[in-house]
Amino acid sequence: KDGSVFLGEITNREGIPNPGHPDHLQKQRILLRIGNRDLYGFDFKWVGEDEIAKREQPKDAYFVERREYGALIGVPVAVKEGDLTLAADSAAARQALPGLIEKAEADRHAVETIEKHEIGDINYRIEKARLEARRLDLVARNEPGRDLSRERAALETTTAEQQALFQAKTVELSTLMEKAGTSFVSFRTAEGGSKELRSLDIYRAYPANELGWFGRLGVYSGRLWEFVSGNPRESNTEGGIFPAIFGTVMMVILMSIVVVPLGVLAALYLREYAKQGALVRTVRIAVNNLAGVPSIVFGVFGLGFFVYFVGGGIDRLFFPEALPTPTFGTGGILWASLTLALLTVPVVIVASEEALAAVPRSMREASLAMGATKFQTILRVVLPAAAPGILTGLILAMARGAGEVAPLMLTGVVKLAPELPLDGFFPFAHLDRKFMHLGFHIYDVGFQSPNVEAAKPMVYTTTIFLLIIVVLLNLTAIIVRNKLREKYKTGAF
């Protein structure tokens, strides 16, 4: 009613209580996502329904997902390729926009391939050559009489080749960026202003008011695939969560590889070998009490022992050429996995002890009567029969480990990891690298984001996906457990 015009989508609706009668609503208001944060300074606005004079659903309005500043909502009015105008009105611009976005996606993929893979690989080799040269300097200092000229010459040749390749790829990238950055789309905003976007910055654009059921399904399918397989952007509030998914799954797998042997060996000793007495009872009580220790305490222990003590020692022994830059002496996925293994090992110990105790005495005696040693009996009879119960402990450990965040904040998780812990360079699994985690991603996006309203969908969707991953990991272990249970089925189970 004041003459303001807004173009956006309704994301929420709530009532405003009457100050005199709190139980009665005075009026209703709606939350509009108007986008265009670079123009307005905000992209969400509350509007009272009694203040609205007229509502329309313009068919030519587009919702544009772009590289930065959130969504842009407007009407395409022109398309330019350098100095050439390809479309000078709204109808022509709408017709040219899909092809332009498709071309921009191909150009963006080519740019990312050169930046992240080709130039990234070259930088990796140059850095390895630099560290090797540094190592040779240390060797020459410790062994003055040793001839290292051949190794130095080979390194200089390798570095020169990689530097030349780097320069060539940089020129290729600049040429591609210059060529791809000449296409622009002009949009008219609700108040009549104009905003020009480079086509390379547009990820998705669609006429929201013209979409039918299949059109909406196509948009949601594209967003879902981008969410699962893409990298985050715009302070993690948009894009995908693939690095967080990968980091979470890899951390849980590493944790499981460590926690199962530790837990089973401890349970075997307590149940099969240790003399039952006051000391063993005390140890069992201590193990049970470990499950109640706050997780942040384990994080502090992991930081002090694994990261600083063990990791620092590894750096001094095996990576002196990289110092003072730490390799293992800083947070990484290995230390995070070991910390969570310590956190969850009491669960595996208790479950494994119960499973070992449930194996019938008759099975042990029959094995011993056949001439088997105690070790053979445990290995061939007791452990297979107790495997379903041990896997139950693993399931509980994975469920707890996948959702922990506090210890990871101290031992290796980061807001954005430029590299995955697994790649094509030897030794392929780089356990010293930092990683992203779905739990920390939820915390970061939900509570550290500069745009809370825009981050809400990412928070809820990531939470659901974390639950799905935990369920899938647990289902896998449950299927294996059930198969083992059927194989070694006895009256004790």
PLM features: what roles do these ranges have?
Residues 349-353, 359-360, 374-412:
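Transmembrane alpha-helices
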